[in-house]
Amino acid sequence: MNICMRNGYEQFSLTSPGTSDLEIGGSFWKDEPDTKYLCLDSPVEQRQHQPPMAVCAGCRLEISDRYFLRVNPNLEFHAQCLKCVQCSRPLDENQTAFVKNGQTYCRDDYRRLFTTRCSRCHGDFDKTDLVMRAGPQNVFHLNCFACVACEKRLQTGEEFQIKNNSLYCRSDCRGLDNPDTSASVPDYSKLNNNNNNDNNNSSSNFDEDEWDEERSTLTSLDNNTSSPLGSPKSDGVRTPLFGHHNSGSGGSTSSCGKKKKDKQATRVRTVLNENQLKILRDCYSINSRPDATLKERLVEMTGLSARVIRVWFQNKRCKDKKRQIQITENRLNSEREEVLNRVRVNGIGPLMVQPATPHIDNTLGGPIDIQHFAQWNGTPPPPPPQYGNPMMFNSPSTFDVSVILAPVAPNVTSPSEALGPLGASVFPHFSPQHAPFTATSHDISSPAPCGE
């Protein structure tokens, strides 16, 4: 019987064990009716026939065991890897598991870590319990939904407030020591009537040179009427004369600094009577920035100089601007403080008691059954193939005759014709002239007695 091996392309004639020679065929593919072909699958083909191995979600290794445990459609574990991440309690198909963020928990740890508890007694809720809700996060038992001060049970429709996670009824919340916010709220009536209070005085002191200190923020509208201090244009204004300041140009920096110190030491004030103040305020209410024509009329009506009128309007605009900024800041601060006080006392405003509802926590998942699966049926899969040299046999007795294929037809002259459609893929470029035939008669011998 002739046997053809893949990857070697040799053909041998096997004789009985009693003979001492192994005849090598004269031609490579002889038409002999007893010729058999041995076809072994390649390692790549063996790998393709194997089913994909499952990966354990606990140890991240392939599951080579015959049986494995499955939790959820995409979580598979070794039997020894499925356990609670908190208490390391083993889980099997006789129990239920809970999954949160890809981690498995037992029932006790899952309820302890993730279930909603009463905001007052910190107890658990049963599925049949009715609960009272105070906002999105505070949940109470029916008996726990009461004022902590008077222990009054709150009914549907009553108002309540929450402070420091404690529940208060409306009457007890009013008695709490709330921060006083009245000081931060400005008195708009006083701010708006500051100008009217000056009418009660028979005279008013006006600082003529006050605007010089704020010259960087506002600009003068009447540059033609501006004149240095001590000029003869300031009619009706008591202005002391300083000889060393008025004589010369006074251009040096040291002289300017000395002049400013002297001016701060002796400030000139103009006294305005009630009639003059009334005329200026009435004009300011109509037009806060009078032009040159209007200023000339004011000079005639009040008897004041143009410079005094210009400085009075500039000071008035600056004071009103500062007052408006202060009012806006006080209003924003009072609103912010009021919101913070409301949050510290009752969260977001006074709350209304709603009817009791069943306790349903949609954020928690239900229990998941653990299923026991077999990774393959019957015998286990073969071990991974070993890549290396072609298979060689030490003796003819090591062949498994059960894997030998069909006999060769008489007119077959090549392995591809002998194996049919499979032969073209197994021996795609086979040629008898280029066969790696190197065996000789003394390379392989028949079994012999131990004496040899």
From Swiss-Prot:
Residues 192-205, 217-227 have a biased composition (Low complexity). It holds the Pfam family Homeodomain. Keywords: DNA-binding, Homeobox, LIM domain, Metal-binding, Nucleus, Repeat, Transcription, Transcription regulation, Zinc. Residues 54-116, 117-179 form the LIM zinc-binding domain. Residues 265-324 bind DNA. Residues 347-376 are annotated as: LIM interaction domain (LID). One of its GO terms (cellular component) is nucleus. CDD domains: homeodomain (cd00086), LIM1_Isl (cd09366). Residues 184-268 are annotated as: Disordered. The keyword Signal does not apply. GO terms for molecular function: DNA binding; DNA-binding transcription factor activity, RNA polymerase II-specific; metal ion binding. It is found in: Nucleus. Expressed in gonadal sheath cells, URA motoneurons, and 10 additional cells near the isthmus and terminal bulb of the pharynx. Expressed in the ALA and BDU cells. Transmembrane segments: none annotated. GO terms for biological process: axonogenesis; body morphogenesis; gonad morphogenesis; head morphogenesis; locomotion; nematode larval development; nematode pharynx development; neuron fate specification. Interacts (via LID domain) with ceh-14 (via LIM zinc-binding domains 1 and 2). Probable DNA-binding transcriptional activator. This is LIM/homeobox protein lim-7. It comes from Caenorhabditis elegans. The lineage of its organism: Eukaryota, Metazoa, Ecdysozoa, Nematoda, Chromadorea. The gene is lim-7.
